[in-house]
């Protein structure tokens, strides 16, 4: 079982969450879909904060997560999304011990 995961919280500038998602859809969704090292990926809006996006990613291993940071689509995503965010994301690494498949 792939056991490396990331919980990520992004905070968009007020009123910019949909714009952040549009950038994510353009660059990240296709890159993630085509990346076999992304085992699972969940992208969602916070139910209690209109500016927060929460993400869970599971990779085959930590090295694969680091390698994805050099993907051209990820670099383009960062260039366009950074001005829409209130700061750097909160990122927590986790060892996935179990998942329901």
Question: Which residues are covered by each model-predicted region?
Answer:
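Active-site-flanking beta-strand signature of metal-NTP-handling nucleotidyl enzymes
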Residues: 3-11
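Short coil/turn motifs at secondary-structure junctions
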Residues: 13-15, 46-48, 60-62
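An amphipathic, aromatic/His-enriched active-site/gating alpha helix that lines ligand/cofactor pockets
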Residues: 26-39, 58-92
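Glycine-rich beta-strand-turn "strand-cap" elements at beta-sheet edges
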Residues: 2, 42-51, 77-101
């Amino acid at each position: 079982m792939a056991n490396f995961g990331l919980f990520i919280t992004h905070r968009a500038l007020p009123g910019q969450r949909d714009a952040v998602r549009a950038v994510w859809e353009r660059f990240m969704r296709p890159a993630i879909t085509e990346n076999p090292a992304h085992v699972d990926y969940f992208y969602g809006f916070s139910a209690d904060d209109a500016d927060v996006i929460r993400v869970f990613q599971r990779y085959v291993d930590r090295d694969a997560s680091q390698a994805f940071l050099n993907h051209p689509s990820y670099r383009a995503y960062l260039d366009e999304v950074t001005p829409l965010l209130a700061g750097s994301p909160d990122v927590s690494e986790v060892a996935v011990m179990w998942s329901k498949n």
